[in-house]
């Protein structure tokens, strides 16, 4: 996994900062960007795929959809539940860590 680069992902820094702020607010442990935006082969209207672990996952998901300054849609996956081995492998291979809580 690597760090965020606006050119690579097409996501404005303001939106990333809003995601990080919400992750802290809802005590999320880790937020990983994956999918076409992490791979760099996204289209202008591609959604933003996020994998999240820890914290108030449901509240974080709702807040990201409602409170970020983008019209792009979000697909938020809870890593603590129901993530298939195939999806976990994709996230591990292509994921970009946007936020990780320091203990």
Q: What are the residue ranges of the model-derived segments?
A:
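Catalytic core of pol beta-like nucleotidyltransferases
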Residues: 1-30, 38-44, 53-103
């Amino acid at each position: 996994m690597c760090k965020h680069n606006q050119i690579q992902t097409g996501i404005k820094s303001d939106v990333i900062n809003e995601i990080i702020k919400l992750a802290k607010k809802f005590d999320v442990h880790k937020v990983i960007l994956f999918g076409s935006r992490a791979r760099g082969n996204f289209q202008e209207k591609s959604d933003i795929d996020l994998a999240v672990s820890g914290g108030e996952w449901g509240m974080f998901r709702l807040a990201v959809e409602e409170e970020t300054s983008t019209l792009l849609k979000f697909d938020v996956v809870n890593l603590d539940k129901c993530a298939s081995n195939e999806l976990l492998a994709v996230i591990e291979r292509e994921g970009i860590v946007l936020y990780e809580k320091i203990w």
